[in-house]
Amino acid sequence: MTVLRPVFEHEVTLPATAMEGEAAAAAVRVRLAALLMQFAKHPHMLIEGLHCRSVKEYTNDAGATVLERELVAGHAVFHDTVTVTEDRVVFAVPETGDMKASTFAISLEGGDGKDLVLRFHYEEDETVKLPAHIEGLRTKAWKAKDQDLAAWCAKHLGI
């Protein structure tokens, strides 16, 4: 069984200006979830060189939307599963061949007059060991991508 370990977590705050009142906050969260779904279906919008070759969408027994994606990055082809709920989006890559298992999750917190916080959480197979300088570069790339995603969402939310 693959054991995943946390490797990086950070958050980006979206200001509450467009979220006054419970109904408005709920509407913003629904729109934000739709934007994150759009990003999951079209990652090339923010990640140059990463394309979805195919996406199968369905609703699981718990009521979450699930995307089974086939992704292409250069010559590499891999699969993942994206699970979208009201307050969380999880990208899960299974272990296949040379690629170790990993997850990337975005949690939505706050709203209703409070700032909306996007918490980004990364986990990977505990056997993955990277040199410190590579780990640092990867972390910077993740953080930049997440900040770009949050800014893109804020722009489309009118925040």
Predicted features and spans:
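Intrinsically disordered, low-complexity terminal tails and linkers in eukaryotic proteins, enriched
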Residues: 151-155
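Intrinsic-disorder/low-complexity, polar/charged segments enriched in Ser/Thr/Lys/Arg/Asp/Glu/Gln
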Residues: 5-9, 66, 115-117
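Hydrophobic ligand-binding cavity/cleft-lining segments
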Residues: 1-60
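Eukaryotic N-terminal targeting leaders
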Residues: 1-3, 156-159
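Glycine-rich portal/gate segments that line the openings of hydrophobic small-molecule binding cavities
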Residues: 54-94
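Beta-strand/loop substructures that line and gate deep hydrophobic ligand-binding cavities in soluble
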Residues: 93-147
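Beta-strand elements of well-folded, non-transmembrane domains
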Residues: 14-16, 73-75, 122-126
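Short, surface-exposed coil-to-beta transition loops
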Residues: 7-9, 75-79, 98-105
